[in-house]
């Protein structure tokens, strides 16, 4: 167990009193460069794995606890030039690895609606800051559900756009083929306003969708939508209140004139193990850069060799969950286990193709297979239950760390497919809408009606 110093949080006295949930790592006041933009008058808090030239960028890790970025992430400059004021950096699971905001060097985040419950992760601080009304909106990152799950637990909206819609330049990577900048807000209106500002091509990010691809994506609105309900999401583990809210949301959209039909996406059943195989492999590669020699926390211990110093720095600088995922990822990439990685990539390709074939609109990057079950959007729960208490989460995690991984079972399919998804609060429970690759506006259109 690493020693955690709560005094390391970089907060002014006023914010420290206001932040009852430990949702912030640092508070800032960075005025916008343009005070008359479309986001004029708004304030936001950004997840602390996104680079800002003001203050620290820690990824909630000891190994980066004193790191100051010399540049802003692209999204920070976009928000500033469009009128929004940055007022803080939010707490998170270290390097985005976790589903409860438990794995932070700066201590756990609590849920504003019930401080005995987890806020979800890894963007728990971002969700808690919105639920606690500390800002107009917050920015998080979503790798396997890290915006949608905390939004569900904290009873706010959490939007993961299509992969490549928003620039990742300046985002500290966990798994770069999955990491997506997401937006958390109290309503769809503010999320749409922020999304319109950030939905721009950035030549500094090679995964950002180029203009010629964006122009091929349909932009027409449909009055009557067909909503698919995959039976693979009808899990026996769903709690009664989650089922009830899901049924309520489906009945509501029927009353609005939309159609609902059952569908099947068989590869969803293989999504969770595929996700953790790929994500940990990418994490092992991405986090190999942190040696604490050039920047970051250094133990400054007297050792016999540079390699020994790096090993000491990494052992002391990374938390237990990050170390676990690095080990899992290195094993996956080893010669003895390479077949698992290849199989996971195949499953991901199959899932992308199956999702693509189910939607009415075509996928701009894939050739769609034919399906008789065409729908416009998909609706499913965001999580299998409401937020667990801290005692329940810790007890389950101590019995088997894999229990916390299962929390992502309903969110990782959209992440693997790279499709847009939003968690909408329905009677205090998150209900998830998913759309075709690039159909972000259609997802937001229906989310605003629920």
Curated annotation (Swiss-Prot):
Any one GO MF term held by the record is: ATP binding
Top enzyme class, one word, equals ligase
Q: Where in the cell is it found?
A: Mitochondrion
Which top-level group of life is the source organism from?
Eukaryota
Which InterPro entries does the entry link to?
Answer: Amidase, Amidase_CS, Amidase_dom, AS_sf, GatA
**UniProt-annotated catalytic positions:** 47, 122, 146
The answer to whether the entry has keyword Phosphoprotein is no
Instruction: State the coiled-coil residue ranges.
Output: none
Swiss-Prot/TrEMBL catalytic activity: L-glutamyl-tRNA(Gln) + L-glutamine + ATP + H2O = L-glutaminyl-tRNA(Gln) + L-glutamate + ADP + phosphate + H(+)
Name the GO terms of the biological process aspect: glutaminyl-tRNAGln biosynthesis via transamidation; mitochondrial translation
Q: Does the keyword Ribonucleoprotein apply?
A: no
SUPFAM superfamilies on file: Amidase signature (AS) enzymes
Name the job this protein performs.
Allows the formation of correctly charged Gln-tRNA(Gln) through the transamidation of misacylated Glu-tRNA(Gln) in the mitochondria. The reaction takes place in the presence of glutamine and ATP through an activated gamma-phospho-Glu-tRNA(Gln).
* Protein name as catalogued: Glutamyl-tRNA(Gln) amidotransferase subunit A, mitochondrial
Recorded source organism is: Candida albicans (strain WO-1) (Yeast)
């Amino acid at each position: 167990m690493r020693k955690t110093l709560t005094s390391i949080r970089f907060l002014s006295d006023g914010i420290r009193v206001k932040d009852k949930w430990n949702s912030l790592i640092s508070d800032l006041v960075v005025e916008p460069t343009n005070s008359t933009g479309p986001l004029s008058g708004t304030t936001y808090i950004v997840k602390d794995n996104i680079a800002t030239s003001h203050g620290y960028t820690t990824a909630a890790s000891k190994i980066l606890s004193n790191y100051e970025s010399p540049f802003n992430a692209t999204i920070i400059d976009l928000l500033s030039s469009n009128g929004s004021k940055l007022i803080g950096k939010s707490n998170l699971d270290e390097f985005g690895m976790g589903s409860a905001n438990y794995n932070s060097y700066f201590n756990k985040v609590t849920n504003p609606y019930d401080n005995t419950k987890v806020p979800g992760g890894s963007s728990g601080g971002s969700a808690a800051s919105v639920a606690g009304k500390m800002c107009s909106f917050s920015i998080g990152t979503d790798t396997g559900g890290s915006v949608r799950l905390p939004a569900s637990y904290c009873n706010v909206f959490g939007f993961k756009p299509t992969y490549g819609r928003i620039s990742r330049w300046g985002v500290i990577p966990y798994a770069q083929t999955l990491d997506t900048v997401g937006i958390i807000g109290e309503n769809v209106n503010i999320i749409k306003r922020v999304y319109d500002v950030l939905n721009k091509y950035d030549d500094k990010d090679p995964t950002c969708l180029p203009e010629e691809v964006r122009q091929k994506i349909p932009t027409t609105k449909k009055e009557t939508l067909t909503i698919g309900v995959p039976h693979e999401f009808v899990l026996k583990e769903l709690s009664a209140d989650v089922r009830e809210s899901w049924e309520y949301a489906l009945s509501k959209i029927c009353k609005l004139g939309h159609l609902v039909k059952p569908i099947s996406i068989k590869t969803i059943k293989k999504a969770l193990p595929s996700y953790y195989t790929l994500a940990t492999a990418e994490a092992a590669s991405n986090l190999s850069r942190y040696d604490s020699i050039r920047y970051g926390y250094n133990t400054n211990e007297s050792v016999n060799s540079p390699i020994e110093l790096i090993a000491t720095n990494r052992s002391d600088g990374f938390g237990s969950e990050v170390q676990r995922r690095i080990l899992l990822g290195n094993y996956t990439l080893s010669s003895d286990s390479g077949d698992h990685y290849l199989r996971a990539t195949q499953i991901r390709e199959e899932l992308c193709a199956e999702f693509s074939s189910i939607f009415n609109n075509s996928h701009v990057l894939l050739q769609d297979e034919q399906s008789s079950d065409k729908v416009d959007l998909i609706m499913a729960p965001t999580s299998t239950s409401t937020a667990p208490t801290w005692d329940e989460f810790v007890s389950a995690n101590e019995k088997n760390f894999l229990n916390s991984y299962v929390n992502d079972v309903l969110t990782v399919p959209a992440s693997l497919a790279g499709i847009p998804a939003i968690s909408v609060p329905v009677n205090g429970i998150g209900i998830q809408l998913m759309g075709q690759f690039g159909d972000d506006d259609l997802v937001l259109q229906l989310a605003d009606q629920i």
